[in-house]
């Protein structure tokens, strides 16, 4: 092994192969996956051999980072230690930046990561692992995470390798071949031998499990045997385990976790294997993971999917990010839990984690169900995190009862873990096992790292491990009992695990229960970092980060992920921390890794620092915290050193934010203390002590720290939440075992929660500078006293953090809030119930914190308890709920289950429930976190993978578990389903799935378990299980009964809660829902029944989602998931939110949906609604949930009801108000959503009285106020056209906008009013989705709106949702736009058009079963159906229900009847209103980031979402609202387009409002913006029937149908891909005949060539017809443009029409014609009304524009317009539109729709051309130019120049010159190859210059000599004769400079005679200089390009040519400068040629 180790190969392969692969592979994550997989298999073997062996430990981390770096930078591997951080950071940044492209990109990234990771760490298991990792990356979303995971894993692996050197060896070969078998066996073998007695079996198991996990992951089956071999138990479990493992494998972490040591490595391998498994794991997946994994697999790369899925799962469950590990966790529930059984199997001892976990608290249960939870949680987690996880899970599982410890098992600590049993036990054992067991440490390389590090410290731990082991054994002996006693034992265990955790051990040894948890905590922090990383990745990472981060952390890596997850899982954290913390080495490593994963760095760093430091700190610190200040310190030192060492290089990068955190390793450590133990809390000692005392706190701290660490608080939070959940679970489990344990756990959580909150807060702070400050606070918080303090301080930070976390990007706030809430809540809950002593303090702090947190979030705390509840309700609703979406229900569910009811019902249930309350709350809280995590990638993948896995898992292994769990579940079903107790677990389980979900399904499941603490609750988990909380489920299966009692109390709530959990699943649950969920649903159904209404709403939401989702989602599943994921991910910033949202929506709906999924769906307000609208609504809920995190839960519940666009939003707003702080977070969305949701929910009484009433009141009040406001404003709005528009709105179209306006009152007062009405109606009628409009919004729009909102918000609101939302939105936009038509007549015409559009959209949607189409279809058709259904049923209810809405609705119906004919229109029109919500969503995201104020900033985010409209909307939402509303829909897509793009991670590409199809877009002659060169010669076509789908897909970012290049009589197929988030098409070798009537079946499409790589052409579809035809189109465009201009914002609407451009085209043309024909008239007309009702006119205009421009690059325009509009609108919300319109009018003349063009080119220069840009200025005008052309088409080159086409051409020209500067032969080569990319632009520009030169020449009389001189010399000196001199009127021209070759621009070698002087007339001198400048312009520009390249090359080391060119081209200011000088030159030439 060592020998392998040495092989730097790992580094190389890692770095090189994988690392760089990412870049290259990024494009094809799949490729990477496959490639990686294939290549890695062999390569990896080698790599693996070395890599793993590689001193990953110290290096691994780095390596990982390096891997990451590698990802980023092939050289990364060389980056090794220093690189890691950077690389990670790079990775993260890359991931984030590429978030959109996540799929491949992320994949590849991850892949890179992963590969390296595996290569690195898992080399041994590498192949599989790597593959898995790779595969993981495969899962688009996951990739990042996966990569991270893998990436991180290496660290753990690295460590692991040590321990597993032999193993590695074994693994190496065997691994390679069997990948899993060997891995497993070898793992087992190695481990076993390594492990020694207790450990052996455990280890063996663990190893086995790990290996098995891995194996299963890798081999699944093969592994299974090995796995089984380990323990007899395993066999059955193997299935599970495999599943688990698969999950794990997928999770890799699971495996890794499971085998933290070797396995960990392997685990990573596992994780890695996961991916490969997909290849090969697929079968395995089939086996176990298959369900889960397969879904993952389902993701693009099946292999990745597993990991992904796992991670997803994890993420979901384990905070997605932890994903890998967490995935395990999450998976655990799924497979882990299921695996739980697997774990359980392991529990039996197999997966030590499971075993341990099972053994731990639930040795039996775990095995049975507790194990499931622990095992499942632990098991699963274990699987995923087997070691770490388990460990963590131990922490988690430990919490789970050590079941979690399966992770420990990973280290064999399982037994220990088991032994530890307690979380601590699990932990300890996990850790110990991992650490100790690994000798475990040694063994648990992953752990080892940590272990090693810790071991380092102790190995002590290593030894400690043994000791731990012994301890563990003790525990082992009494794992179950330890569970009770485990806390302390856990601590001891912790100790044990600590070894893993080392610190844990140290501390654990301390035996402080807290320490255990602390360890967890540590793990968590670690996890957090992971998370952080994840978060960094946010979507991918986030998802992954968690898994990843954890991985990273877990990597020290695996552990990190594991523990991160675990930490998330809390115990897992512990376990993981070992990875991370334990890893002193890993910690170091982790740190490194974490740091490495810079994303983690902050968190990681922090975490790491904390993890490393904190780790150390955490582990150490944690442990320290735990109490062994000394050892920890020691460890810290050591670890710190390592970490620092590792981290340092890497950390610093990460450290930036985290650095402080991490960077501080020591300090950070201390600082991290917080993270680490309070670690950074400056007072490491204190924190430590505190930690000790308050390990929970510490834990939380850890968690929080994690969060904090997490920059990506979201993930961190999630993770934290998960961790907490886990911890909770653990606690509960433990608690169950022993209240104390619980307390510990809980306390951990509680304190942790607080801490978490603090940390979260802190976390964000880390992200923000505040973080650091905050950190101390959190620190303090950590400290008991600090608690309150922290809260105080925290609150502010939390928002930050929250935002950070939540939004991760834009949505952090919500996320944070959610997280905070969850954390806090859980803390409180936990604290309250558990906090006996420490807990209580924590609780107070928690409450305080919570309160502060809430407040900070905008949640208003109520009573602490109530507040908690409310918080849960509110916060959760607001922030969390958003997360929870249904989470609210979730919280209730948890609350209900445990505390769910408390949430709604009160805390009693929670309390009654047995600490469940806290748990419940906690769970929910966690859930949000989890959710956050989950949604990211998880959602999609999960949906895809998740479901299958669930089903399979449930069906198969899961089924077993499930059966187990099933009955209990059934029992608990009520509990889970309806019963709160189960609910929480369910939630939890879902949590794992959707970490944010319930308490964290996987991890959370454990958390839930904690909730259930209750193992019973775990059963609830079972409920969750369906979600994929199998682990939890199984885990909980046993406990279901206990939960059942709670269920009753919490039924109402619980349903929601349960629902939430399920919802969680729902995220991806559809399938899960169907499967696992089914039980849940079934069981839950009844309980849910009460809340049925709520659920109906929620359910509807869920159900809808489920139904729609299932069909659409599932149908779209493959694509849609990715899309969704992308969607979720797409909004990286949003991602967190999205994640959260996603989860929540799903959760809410999910649970219900799950339950609802059952037919009971109808249960909720009406199945129909659920079916039709709900589905949409769910989206909205998600949106609401996501966007209105705070409100969401409330919203979620409410939202379902108030899913309507405005309504939900508004409710949210109310909610927001209610959660005032939250509001800021989500303000728009939040508030509206909350308000709406709240109102609606309230109406429905979502399940939280608190929630309801609060929400209701607030919502209602708010809504009413808003309505009033709107109404007041309405008169204005109503003026003239506005009035008609208002009617239109009333009809529903604009309602949402109104609502939105309501949300953002400014948004659209008029709109607001109508929306208000709907809102009101909706509110009352939320279930029905009150007004038809709303309902349709809910349905058509709800989905769309919700989606939009969510998407806009970047909520993951449901990845599924987002997609749906997107589709729906798109559809809606289409429909709405047309229907929106600004005018009544327009309306009518548009109605027709709309119908057409809708039909086309629908057909498109239907056509492409793309998620979009499907969803859209669903929205359109189905939404129509749902909308229809909604409109039908909902409308009916809506009408009645929606008081106002009803009225508006009828109008809508009436007005939209034409559209309505296609019901979709009505719904669609209604959808427009939803768009407003989306808009709010947009704003919301910004709000997430900031409230309305934020909204402007967010607008950017949102703007992207609603490029034109949104952007205006956010700032001028009020004014923009109306506009925004309709546009919003489009905007939403648009926003999604932009937002998604960035955010959209893997599967969804950036949105494009439309596609330039010949005939449809010709009128818009604008140049198509964007990169690439239009080659006139090439003709591309698309099937006519695919056009709508294409447009829809482009708008939603989903996968479009293929396009074809005409090659004479053949058509060459170009298939869609995503690169850098951008949708592009790659040439394939598939051809079709193109002759005869085939030619009639295709329509020409305009594309631009992007590049030719490997002889493959890559093109992108233009949104507008390329510039090649600008003149004519320009003119036409001018006219159209004027409207466009006027309605630049309107661009978004066009987007909508875009989908059905064709149909719309006619209408467009027709309806447009009037406007077009009378643009001025029309324009003016709208302006007048516009003034009164700007929005409307704007919207109208937009619509018109849309119409006019139709598909014109609305997007670009939108963006531009958004930009412009934004400023304009911002300036005057109302005015902008008006001004805009008027402006538009002038613009009209100039025809400059600055917005449009500006988008791409003027992003920076936007200001110029923005609002006033002026025709030329606005030259975004380019298109405008067209307008200008009318003036003088060619007259003003300047103007022409400013066109987008010209800009693109010029950009290409500069790129060519830059390339020439780097390669002198470039131009010649271009000529020789007849390059079509650069030559045409060059020739055009040269021709332009020559043309002007000739014109100038006409004014000159040049002598041949002078002309020759001017031509020869590039410089010209002009000397004016002085006065009095004879030549007074003359000027001397002195040509100078070095002559050059005009063609190649290279200097002439021959000497040229020196130029003489020439005298010319003064008046003519300007002509000479102008002529000279024109002649030499190319050379002069070339020289400037050369200077630029030299500057870049000078500043960076060996950059490749490509990189230099890219950097130059990214220098927008420089490009603008060049372009401006070029424009000026031509303008000058023009002026001179005219006069003279």
Curated annotation (Swiss-Prot):
Positions of region (Disordered): 210-283, 331-587, 649-697, 758-850, 859-878, 886-925, 952-1068, 1120-1260, 1294-1347, 1376-1573, 1668-1840
Location of the protein in the cell: Nucleus; Postsynaptic density; Synapse, Synaptosome
Residues recorded as bearing N6-acetyllysine in the entry: 1223
UniProt feature, compositional bias: Low complexity: 249-258, 340-365, 411-432, 441-458, 802-817, 1182-1194, 1817-1829
Positions with biased composition (Basic residues): 1199-1208
Compositionally biased spans, kind Pro residues: 223-240, 479-490, 833-847, 1037-1052, 1306-1317, 1324-1338, 1420-1438, 1458-1535, 1691-1703
This protein's GO CC annotations: neuron projection; nucleus; postsynaptic density
Originating species: Homo sapiens
Database matches in Pfam families: DUF4211
Residues found modified as Phosphothreonine: 738, 1304, 1561, 1705
Keyword annotations of the record: Acetylation, Disease variant, Intellectual disability, Nucleus, Phosphoprotein, Synapse, Synaptosome
Disease named in the record: Neuroocular syndrome 1: An autosomal dominant form of neuroocular syndrome, a group of disorders characterized by developmental delay, impaired intellectual development and ocular anomalies as primary findings. Variable eye abnormalities include anophthalmia, microphthalmia, and coloboma. Other common features include congenital heart and kidney defects, hypotonia, failure to thrive, and microcephaly.
Bias type Gly residues, positions: 367-380, 391-400, 543-558, 673-683
Entry-annotated residues carrying Phosphoserine: 332, 340, 651, 865, 1077, 1135, 1308, 1381-1382, 1387, 1568, 1925
Domain of life: Eukaryota
The organism's taxonomic lineage, starting at the top: Eukaryota, Metazoa, Chordata, Craniata, Vertebrata
Bias (Basic and acidic residues): 1209-1223, 1541-1553, 1704-1715, 1737-1769
UniProt protein name: Proline-rich protein 12
